[in-house]
Amino acid sequence: MRSKRDVELFSGAVITAALLAGMGTSALADTPEWCKNIQNGIYCAAPEAEVPHFCGTKKISVALADGFADNGWRQQTTAAGINEASRCPNVTSWTHTDGQGNTQKSISDLQSLAAKGVNAIVVFPDAGPAMLPAIRDAFKQGSAVVPYRAKVGGTEGKDYTVFVGTDFKNDGYEWGKWMVKALNGKGNIAYLGGPPGTSESLEKAEGLKEAFAGTEIKWIGQQPFEVTNWDPSKMATVMSALIAKYPQIDGIFADLSGPVLTSGAFPRANRPLPLIGGEDANVFGCTWEKLQKEDSKNPFQFTTSSAEQWNIRLAIQWAIASAAGGKVDQPLIITDTKGLKHTVANPGDKIVKNFTMDDSLKREIYCLKELPESAGTGTSLTIEQTLASLKGGL
């Protein structure tokens, strides 16, 4: 994750402040040309003493096939993917496609990448199993294909190279246990998920239900989750409908959680902010600090886990290693903005382990005044890279 200084720790290789200080013209001279051509090379990794093992030696092309790319989380994730791929001098090109939330376009994008002979393709398959035939075809055409985060079914080694994911159920469970404690085991909650049927939201819902067992927590709204497509405007519409239907909403969970606050849905309806469990965003800590400064007894509380913009790093590693003859035999270690280090994957892992960012009940919060509300506070990017990514265009 992003450090307050320009110090980053990527996949177990610590880049020192002295090395970063030299990240000028001479460093860029050793940077892949394709990376220098993306927003003047701002996302390019600093030089390392040893080429990471996952890079291999074969010259390859790399692509990220996104099912939907038009939100801040995806832009920060893309920036992290560019940064990770740029660590390998043998990567010759980078392509990013945006399915725009349209399954057929996502399929066409992937088919096009395979037809062009892209060697390593990371896929965020928002449409889930509907993407499997195209993923299988790309794999059979010779590309190393790594779907990540959203499950597509199929078999590793037969339909795609590997699947890289995270333990979404545990995220839901941790959010739920926190909410049970914060509400003293009683209250009305709703869960805002992603697209219909997405494995991420389904698994988080399982974790939430497990955490609520034996309590008086009541699940309101659509189950297993309110469909929002991870679209802030859709989230605002869903929240307005929930507010109109339910006179009491004590807690809300959300995958893309920042819009719960930034939409202004609750203040506009003259309703108190609910307690929130979700993925980290700068708006949470900064809002909490502001409200506490105004009134130390303000009831607003929240918890977040890392939004895992860094999850793509492991997917990139596996895709490149598979295409270029490398090995994923080093840990993936993330440093947060307070300088705390988190080992999110051990050598050979394909599933990352998340960690808690904020817990306002413990007065442990992240608020970076340099960043806008929508920015993640655990992205694995520098502040400058995060700001650049939020301008879009990746």
What do the predicted segments below correspond to?
Residues A18-A27, A281:
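C-terminal segment of classical bacterial N-terminal signal peptides
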Residues R2-A13:
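Bacterial N-terminal signal peptides that target proteins for export
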Residues V14-I15, P259:
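Long alpha-helical scaffolds
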Residues R2-S3, L28-L394:
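A residue-level marker of the well-folded mature domains of exported/periplasmic proteins
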Residues G12-A13, G22-S26, L390-G393:
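Low-complexity, intrinsically disordered/propeptide-like segments
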